[in-house]
Amino acid sequence: MALHQSNIIINILLVSAFLLNLVFAFIIIFMERRTANSIWAWLLVLVFLPLVGFILYLLLGRQIQREHIFKLAKEDKVGLEMIVDEQLEALKKQDFSKGNHQIVKFKEMVQMLLYNNAAFLTTDNDLTIYTDGHQKFDDLINDIRHAQSYIHIQYYIIHSDNLGKQLLHELEKKAEEGIEVKMLYDDMGSRDLRKKDLKKFRQKGGHAESFFPSKLPLINLRMNNRNHRKIVVIDGTIGYVGGFNVGDEYIGKSKKFGYWRDTHLRIKGDAVNALQLRFILDWNSQSTRDNLTYESRYFPDVDSGGTIGIQIASSGPDEDWEQIKYGYLKMISSAKESIYIQSPYFIPDQAFLDSIKIAALGGVDVNIMVPNKRDHPFVYWATLKNVASLLEAGVNVYHYDNGFLHSKTLVIDDEVASVGTANMDNRSFTLNFEVNAFIYDEGVARSLKQAFINDMKLSNKLTSEEYAKRNLLVKFKEGISQLLSPIL
């Protein structure tokens, strides 16, 4: 009798799992915006892992309802629509460049980012490029110490290690001085940020919010959609954006990764207003009691003395368009002479890969650099498979060997560049919340290109002959990783 009841229970569980898989399969195919590759990948997971497939889907596969995010993010747009309309009209009249040759030459790209992302163009910026974590954090801490009104700081990862505690200590001192300090961190990325450190930060007068916190113990049903942005705005006059997170490993103190090679920007000029707007929207999406409203001090007029053109573009699962991806594609298709790409994870879709092949086959000098260290095994092998597929088209591929390469940069024709948080993979393009600076300036483009060339001396060039010698186990790892790449 007991055995019969056990069999009934098992059968009920199996039927329930099967029905759940059918429901999720229906949702994936008919109700969510997905690529064909992503649909097939999730269907394979649900079919071949019937007992755990729906759990994996709950954790990793659910898409955010865009309407929900729009409700979270509604905030006065501080005249944004008017600015965008004015700039689009100026583009039509050819009255837009203020002497910037790159803006005239790449006006279609400027228009695309304006139209799709409301990424208004600023032309009076000055910036500093960082490729080393020590330099970046030395300057950031110095800027924090000189803050007069407020500090808005947002990172995907903040660790409770030496660097993390040092940064929190500097922020706490400013909060005690009466400076407004607001810190937004990602709940998953900053899971090692200790509660006692946050408690102390708040006791000192700081305000902290986590992005998409878990409502259940030990599990976060929105773990697949993370805020990967790294933004700092100080007094509305200085802004930071780029790839560095906060932790000892990002200044080269990790035994696993060694030296951490990244790219980050310090901006002075009106582009800081765009970073400020992005921070306010993100902050208000998570804060229920301490919303930021439009104040003139948050958007001051800044006389940086600079002449660099910048658009700040953001993307995320709340958007209808993959704006940063489109920006990358527009840059690649516009290149006439050279393309330089650095990305720790290189798992774009086939159309993206084809755009790179087309550029290379058309005579453009295409160079891609990826790390030779394995941050995430499946991602590493999928990246290797993708970059190797470009070799026969004439693309130059380099494996960075001097630690871990985390830089996300794209430079074309010594004229236009992009630096930010978005990797060249499906996760950054469609799942995570990202932010990039698109920069129209020869000097900046050449500096980033030179940084790439310097890194070549610390890298190994991958050849078709070398790649062909890989063993059966490597081929198997690549195959499995490639199959899973749409959901990595």
From Swiss-Prot:
The chain crosses the membrane at residues 8-28, 39-59. The keyword Membrane applies. The active site is at residues 228, 230, 235, 406, 408, 413. It catalyses: 2 a 1,2-diacyl-sn-glycero-3-phospho-(1'-sn-glycerol) = a cardiolipin + glycerol. One of its GO terms (biological process) is cardiolipin biosynthetic process. It is found in: Cell membrane. Its main location: membrane. One of its GO terms (cellular component) is plasma membrane. GO terms for molecular function: cardiolipin synthase activity. Residues 223-250, 401-428 form the PLD phosphodiesterase domain. Its EC number is 2.7.8.-. Keywords: Cell membrane, Lipid biosynthesis, Lipid metabolism, Membrane, Phospholipid biosynthesis, Phospholipid metabolism, Repeat, Transferase, Transmembrane, Transmembrane helix. It is an enzyme of class 2 (transferase). Catalyzes the reversible phosphatidyl group transfer from one phosphatidylglycerol molecule to another to form cardiolipin (CL) (diphosphatidylglycerol) and glycerol. Belongs to the phospholipase D family. Cardiolipin synthase subfamily. This is Cardiolipin synthase 2. It comes from Staphylococcus epidermidis (strain ATCC 35984 / DSM 28319 / BCRC 17069 / CCUG 31568 / BM 3577 / RP62A).
